[in-house]
Amino acid sequence: MKKIFLAVLAVATVFTVSAQYKAPQIVANGGYHKHASSGAKNSMSALKAAQKLKIYGSECDVNLTKDGKVLVVQSGWHPGGKANPKADVQRSSAKKMLDIPFANGEYISTLEDFLKRAAKKPATKLILDLKSQATLQRETKLVDEVLAIVEKAGMQSNVEYLAAHPWVAFELVKKAPQGSAIAYLGNDYDPVYVKGMGCTSLDYNIKVWKKKKNWIKQAHKLGLVVNAWVVNKEEDIRWCIQNGVDIITTDEPVLAKKIVKEMCGKQK
């Protein structure tokens, strides 16, 4: 009888510990690129691998070519591997960029192609990180093009936006459909200012949140979503859960899922 009581007590204790934390959502940074069959951030296979995990979202970077085409690519210099040619996305034509392979042999995707794939598994949102451009005019062009492509694909309710440059954030707030999720991706503005910008979320590096932990409660009081990136270490994932972070963006979504389940029960 005593053994049964202790077993029940142990189960109750585990449940109590798990129940005290709210489960954060998980976003795969650049897709699940560490999956054996993907291996490249922003590749189509990385998006597919993230969708198979049934997590909240898969992040990808969107950039504007010299001739105004929106491509899914991480930065100015395409990460094609040392043996492959490099090109500045913003100073190159779409044709040139689309001919450069990723290190895993895949090629860059257009935003249209990514949205087609996202539509097949709408439970996993596509998180679009609009990259800063050389001029404000190009940033406005990028915002306009992205919003038009998303609208044409009928994916407004399945897409969220990240903006590292304030101008991109202001343009998104002004032009995106009402109710769109728009995060300021930076580290310099406090929650009050970000709320004033019209954004719905702060997407800051884990180091910023640890340094300014009071911003988490402040953001929540203002109705803002708190997102931390790039959270890869087990201790950092646990810290985010313990401190009420709403979204964890990570290169290690499988590890994050495991820890969320352990500390919070089944992810919502």
Q: Which stretches of residues belong to each language-model region?
A:
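Bacterial Sec-dependent N-terminal signal peptides
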Residues: M1-K22
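Phosphate-group recognition and catalysis centered on beta-loop-alpha active-site segments
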Residues: A19-K268
